[in-house]
């Protein structure tokens, strides 16, 4: 992977404004250099390279990116995705995103305490499994509000449209109509029980990244879209082992440790 591409992306992520409400997130524009983004669009795999989720999510086609899986892609695109997968699953890429959210990650310590012990690789570090899904969603795809699975801590969505024709086929964030509703395990809820705060549009060369919490409610609105397919790459590192993750990474436990009183206070007020 070209170092210029990496540095462009890292700078775009660092410059993105971190918003704390309703949960920590960033929306990055022009995350990749224009020329590289055009090449990426040309290298999107053909439909027959994708697997299909079982009902009721059969409108989502996917490729779980890993060294062994990218090797099986159509020859014309395989090398590109092999290099891209190696980059976004690198220690370097992981650390850029973790540093962006920083001590905010500690607010979930009460949920993660046992997992940090179970997945420790040393007294100081915990195992992290890099994992990504390249998906193609078709016209009737929708997802009810959910907070995401328990082993995740940061979730990224690279949007790869060719133009703005599917811009409303984005990711929405929500708050529950009952403010007391939170959920760490993350069942999929009904849209009608939530207020939509904002929809992050499916625009070319953008990326939404958010922090998993017990109130990181997000989903996809029910709408009738054209059936050309929405191309998105979900970057979803997980604490511990994960299916399909072939090269484990690690992070210092301090990123997830019990926050001090001052840390809790500054995080609460959005410092």
Would you name each region that the model predicts?
Residues 8-12, 68-69, 120-122:
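Short, flexible segments with low predicted structural confidence
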Residues 5, 15-18, 23, 135, ...:
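Short, functionally important structural connectors and interaction interfaces within domains
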Residues 7, 38, 116:
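Aromatic-glycine hotspot motif
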Residues 1-21, 253-271:
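Fe(II)/2-oxoglutarate
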Residues 15-108:
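Non-heme Fe(II)/2-oxoglutarate
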Residues 86, 94-248:
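Catalytic core of non-heme Fe(II) oxygenases with the double-stranded beta-helix
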Residues 59-65, 116-127, 253-262:
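Amphipathic alpha-helical surface "interface" segments used
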């Amino acid at each position: 992977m070209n170092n210029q591409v990496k540095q462009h992306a890292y700078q775009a992520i660092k410059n993105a404004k971190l918003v704390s409400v309703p949960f920590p997130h960033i929306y990055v524009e022009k995350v990749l250099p224009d020329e590289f983004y055009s090449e990426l669009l040309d290298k999107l795999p053909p439909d027959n390279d994708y697997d299909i989720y079982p009902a009721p999510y059969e409108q989502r086609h996917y490729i779980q990116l890993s060294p062994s899986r990218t090797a099986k892609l159509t020859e014309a695109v395989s090398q590109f995705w092999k290099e891209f997968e190696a980059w976004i699953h690198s220690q370097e890429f992981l650390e850029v995103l973790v540093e962006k959210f920083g001590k905010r990650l500690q607010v979930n310590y009460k949920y993660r305490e046992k997992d940090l012990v179970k997945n420790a690789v040393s007294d100081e570090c915990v195992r992290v499994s890099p994992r990504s899904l390249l998906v193609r969603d078709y016209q009737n795809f929708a997802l009810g509000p959910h907070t995401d699975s328990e082993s995740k801590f940061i979730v990224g969505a690279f949007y790869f449209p060719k133009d703005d024709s599917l811009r409303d086929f984005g990711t929405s964030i929500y708050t529950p109509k009952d403010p007391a509703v939170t959920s760490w395990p993350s069942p999929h809820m009904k849209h009608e029980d939530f207020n939509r705060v904002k929809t992050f549009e499916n625009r070319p060369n953008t990326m939404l990244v958010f922090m998993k919490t017990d109130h990181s409610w997000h989903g996809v609105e029910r709408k009738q879209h054209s059936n050309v397919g929405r191309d998105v790459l979900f970057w979803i590192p997980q604490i511990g082992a994960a299916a399909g993750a072939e090269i484990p990474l690690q992070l210092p436990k301090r990123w997830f440790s019990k926050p001090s009183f001052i840390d809790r206070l500054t995080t609460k007020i959005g410092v």
